[in-house]
């Protein structure tokens, strides 16, 4: 199944998943409350890598469910019916027949009834693939993101490490992605 229609759910207890049409990407509502997009085979954990996470691991009380609501919002609820993550698409677009699709590009997309995109994660490209294993469905879960990062889009790309012998610059802020040398702004 690659589509979650309005009124449908993914449950953390049922091991239900969404799988892209090409069978390359899997979206899993995990027992720890984390909604995670994986690339690779679920048959072999060594071939499975995390691409995106809702960063809702450990929030609320399990079991959890992902719901495509009638108002257009994609929401993760805990067992006490408290929302622990949402796409923020409530009331957007043309009302009725909302759906969430896992595209063959590795994108999670929420549509209205006229296929207008209300929410989208970034497409998965070779440049963005992570080589770090992430929360395994059958293992001990870890968060897919460090605590300071948001639970949508791709994790921040690592920057250059500080260069030895170069003190931090004062004055103009450094350009992201480029190491700064003393006296250069």
UniProtKB/Swiss-Prot annotation:
Composition bias, Low complexity: 141-157, 172-185
Disordered: region residues: 138-185
A GO term, aspect molecular function: identical protein binding
An annotated GO BP: response to other organism
UniProt region (5 X 6 AA tandem repeats of G-Y-P-X-Q-[PH]), positions on chain: 153-182
Compositionally biased spans, kind Pro residues: 158-171
Tree of life domain: Eukaryota
Signal peptide: none
Ranges for the Sequence repeats: 153-158, 159-164, 165-170, 171-176, 177-182
Subcellular location: Golgi apparatus membrane; Endomembrane system; Cytoplasm, Cytoskeleton
Membrane topology classification: Peripheral membrane protein
Cross-referenced PROSITE patterns: BULB_LECTIN
Post-translational modification: The N-terminus is blocked.
CDD domains: B_lectin (cd00028)
Cellular component aspect of the GO annotation: cell-cell junction; cytoskeleton; endosome; Golgi apparatus; Golgi membrane; Golgi-associated vesicle membrane; lipid droplet; phagocytic vesicle
UniProt keywords, alphabetically: Actin-binding, Cytoplasm, Cytoskeleton, Golgi apparatus, Lectin, Membrane, Repeat
Domain Bulb-type lectin: 1-123
Cross-referenced SMART domains: B_lectin
Subunit structure: Homodimer in solution.
Function: May have a role in cell motility. It has high affinity for both G-actin and F-actin. Binds to vesicle membranes via mannose residues and, by way of its interaction with actin, links these membranes to the cytoskeleton.
UniProt-recorded name of the protein: Comitin
């Amino acid at each position: 199944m690659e589509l979650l229609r309005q009124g449908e759910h993914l449950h953390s207890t049922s091991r239900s998943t969404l799988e892209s049409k090409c069978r390359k990407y899997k979206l899993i509502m995990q027992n720890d409350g984390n909604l995670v997009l994986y690339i690779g085979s679920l048959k072999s954990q060594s071939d499975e890598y995390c691409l995106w996470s809702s960063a809702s691991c450990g929030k609320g009380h399990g079991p959890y469910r992902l719901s495509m609501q009638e108002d257009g919002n994609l929401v993760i609820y805990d067992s006490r019916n408290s929302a622990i993550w949402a796409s923020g698409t409530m009331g957007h677009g043309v009302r009725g027949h909302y759906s969430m699709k896992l595209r063959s590009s590795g994108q999670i997309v929420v549509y209205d009834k006229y296929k207008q995109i209300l929410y989208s994660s970034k497409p998965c490209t070779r440049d963005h693939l992570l080589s770090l294993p992430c929360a395994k469905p059958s293992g001990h879960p870890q968060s897919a993101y460090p605590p300071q990062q948001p639970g949508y889009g791709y994790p921040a790309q690592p920057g250059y490490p500080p260069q030895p012998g170069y003190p931090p610059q004062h004055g103009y802020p450094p350009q992201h992605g480029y190491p700064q040398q003393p006296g250069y702004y």
